[in-house]
């Protein structure tokens, strides 16, 4: 069984336990580069399926490397055709709320690729034990809350609404699948994406 740490803000976790100085950092699913807002870094690469994010980031932070990957993603890139390909290696990979919107087969394949190119991975996900996270998503997206019992009883559960997908995992199940240990995370209550655990691989 995976031991869960106490709740913490993942930003504080990075400040306390992760040394980024002189490290090559890959931000997988970087979106608009929010990682740089709380952890400025010199040797940073952001990768995302959204071309508009990458183009905007190139203008805002031209000193960093930005990669557009046209990979399939149920929520953000349904027409994507590529698989994740990396040509460099990195000391650290961070990924916030990306596994949340992927199916298990895609997660396993993606994490396998990331592990080949990154020494340390920090990947967030939703737990099937966290009713508050589930209810917060439902409130935020106007989704009926009738599925919690199903989510709570399964090792893996997909909550689909229109073309949106949220994936919930049993902690031990996903940690075993990805050969990881799990840490408990908590952002502020105003950010539902932060109500996640973080796999440390």
Give a label for each model feature.
Residues 1-23, 28-84, 102, 106-109, ...:
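Class I (Rossmann-like) S-adenosyl-L-methionine-dependent methyltransferase catalytic domain
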Residues 23, 91, 119:
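Conserved acidic residues
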Residues 88:
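Active-site charged/polar residues at nucleotide-handling catalytic sites that mediate phosphoryl
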Residues 94:
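A conserved beta-strand element that flanks and buttresses the S-adenosyl-L-methionine
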Residues 97-98:
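Short catalytic micro-motifs in class I SAM-dependent methyltransferases
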